[in-house]
């Protein structure tokens, strides 16, 4: 039962570099120059030039979850292990456990890509795509596991850098592709314009200078932490995809390139239609208004054996308040009635922050260190939280560059190679190149292609993919799965699964689909005597 629960935790779930469909997943993302039909949108819109008829999505789902620490194999080794007796046959070193952590945190990521049925289609060189992308990530500092294994070491400062993020957006894209000839060479060009509907955004981060911590000394404990939880509902943005394909450019090799989500951004504001339509539901659920966030802090001050049992000594305190974030603070001479904060300059030329709102105590204002300040918001009006100095949530939408080559070998199948890199590290993106190599084998049967692929580099661990397709007339069924950090399930530290059902009417005239009840020959019954 425990193993089944672990499999669910590791493998039941899955931004810019997401695998968008089952075939792409089976090819480990090596898809830039081979994606076809509606599936080329979001990967390389130039491939729409080769679309001869109608291709339509009926159902599709892609989910993944990956971590950088625990696998089923490691769990089985730790389950029942002896961590102290080195002579035990089940001994497992604590240092070896901590050595499994890459960096200073245990990172856990999950995501979902959910295309809306029917509303993803391409007709010849024009296409429409609509889908939801959701991504979450949270990290646990390695010091938590260190304390669990070794206890709190004296005079060692254990950092408590807890944090995470979540974003969910709908994308609606319109694509168009065109073939041009240059010096006798065909060139495919494609473009996609995307409207982005931001549904929800959450982010928790450690804002204490030098980091939140716990410290054990000879006779006492000390701890301190400050965290900010940001949220937003209802955003709007746009982005663009540009694609290029050189079909059979050199000895049958196709060369493709694309820029995905170029110039993309999402801004969450109070006048957004999503916010206006569902704003009351969001506020009643979260208890927060637009541009209002949670500030959390705690402090453990010199707790010892004596103070722990002394009821008159308050050694622990915690707080949770609603705040607004204010930046672009004006100088005193530019101060306008209604401004929350303003700067004055003393005789030494230093800027000092002042409060323009009488209901706020200057001692409660928290400097974030980047020209922004946290201000308690319980006494502020909604209009003040949405003033020119109040900070709106404005996110850069993850964008990436894709480069790919492929070739269709007779009596074998397709070999495809891709290089992908992001322009930032936000929401699952990576600004490091990731190499993907894959093959789609149709030698056994053109109606049953088998896909095998692998990816290396970038921010995520190496991954290994396997998938297949089945064609029944115009109906296409595809399945793909990917394991991270291992080829087999027990060694993997994450997994991704995808299913896809679609229609392709390119060869519709040649299809022969018959529906009927199969003829059943019943055995003859013996004649009864008269």
Residue ranges of each PLM-predicted region?
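Sec-dependent N-terminal signal peptides
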Residues: 3-14
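General helical structural elements
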Residues: 6-8, 27, 198
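Outer-membrane beta-barrel porins/channels
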Residues: 17-25, 122, 126-530
């Amino acid at each position: 039962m425990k193993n089944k629960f672990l499999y669910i935790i590791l493998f039941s779930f899955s931004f810019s570099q997401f695998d968008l469909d089952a075939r792409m997943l089976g090819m480990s993302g090596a898809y830039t120059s081979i994606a076809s039909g509606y599936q080329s949108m979001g990967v390389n819109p130039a491939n729409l030039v080769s679309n001869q008829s109608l291709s339509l999505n009926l159902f599709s789902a892609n989910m993944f979850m990956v971590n950088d620490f625990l696998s089923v194999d490691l769990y089985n080794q730790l389950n029942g292990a002896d961590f102290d007796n080195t002579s035990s046959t089940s001994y497992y070193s604590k240092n070896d456990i901590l050595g499994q952590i890459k960096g200073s945190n245990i990172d856990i990521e999950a995501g979902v890509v959910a295309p809306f049925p029917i509303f993803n289609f391409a007709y010849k060189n024009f296409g429409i795509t609509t889908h939801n992308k959701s991504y979450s990530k949270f990290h646990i500092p390695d010091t938590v596991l260190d304390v669990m294994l070794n206890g709190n070491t004296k005079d060692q400062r254990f950092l408590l850098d807890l944090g995470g993020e979540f974003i969910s957006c709908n994308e609606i894209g319109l694509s168009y592709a065109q073939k041009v000839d240059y010096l006798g060479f065909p060139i495919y060009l494609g473009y996609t314009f995307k409207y982005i509907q931001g549904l929800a955004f959450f982010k928790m981060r450690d804002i204490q200078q030098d980091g939140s911590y716990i410290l054990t000394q000879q006779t006492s404990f000390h701890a301190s932490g400050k965290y900010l939880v940001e949220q937003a509902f209802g955003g709007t943005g746009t982005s663009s995809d540009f694609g290029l394909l050189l079909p059979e450019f050199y000895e049958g090799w196709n060369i493709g390139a694309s820029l995905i989500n170029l110039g993309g951004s999402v801004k969450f504001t109070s006048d957004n239609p999503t916010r206006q339509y569902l704003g009351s539901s969001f506020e009643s659920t979260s208890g927060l208004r637009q541009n209002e966030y949670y500030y959390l802090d705690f402090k453990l001050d010199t707790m010892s054996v004596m103070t722990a049992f002394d009821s008159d000594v308050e050694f622990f305190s915690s707080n949770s308040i609603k705040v607004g974030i204010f930046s672009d603070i004006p100088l005193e001479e530019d101060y306008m009635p209604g401004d929350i904060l303003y700067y004055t300059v003393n005789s030494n030329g230093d800027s000092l922050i002042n409060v323009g709102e009488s209901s706020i105590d200057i001692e409660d204002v928290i400097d974030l260190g980047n020209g922004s300040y946290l201000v308690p918001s319980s006494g502020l009006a909604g209009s003040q939280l949405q003033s020119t100095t109040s900070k709106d949530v404005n996110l850069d939408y993850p964008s990436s560059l894709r480069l790919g080559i492929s070739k269709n070998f007779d009596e074998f199948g397709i070999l495809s190679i891709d290089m992908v890199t992001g322009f930032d590290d936000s929401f699952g993106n990576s600004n490091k190149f990731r190499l993907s190599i894959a093959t789609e084998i149709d030698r056994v049967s053109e109606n049953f292609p088998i896909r095998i692929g692998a990816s290396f580099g970038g921010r995520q661990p190496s991954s290994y993919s396997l998938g297949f397709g089945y064609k029944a007339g115009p109906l296409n069924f595809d399945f793909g799965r990917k394991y991270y950090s291992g080829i087999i399930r027990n060694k993997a530290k994450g997994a991704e699964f995808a299913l896809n059902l679609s229609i392709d009417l390119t060869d519709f005239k040649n299809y022969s689909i018959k529906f009927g009840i199969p003829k059943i020959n019943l055995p003859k019954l013996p004649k009864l005597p008269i």
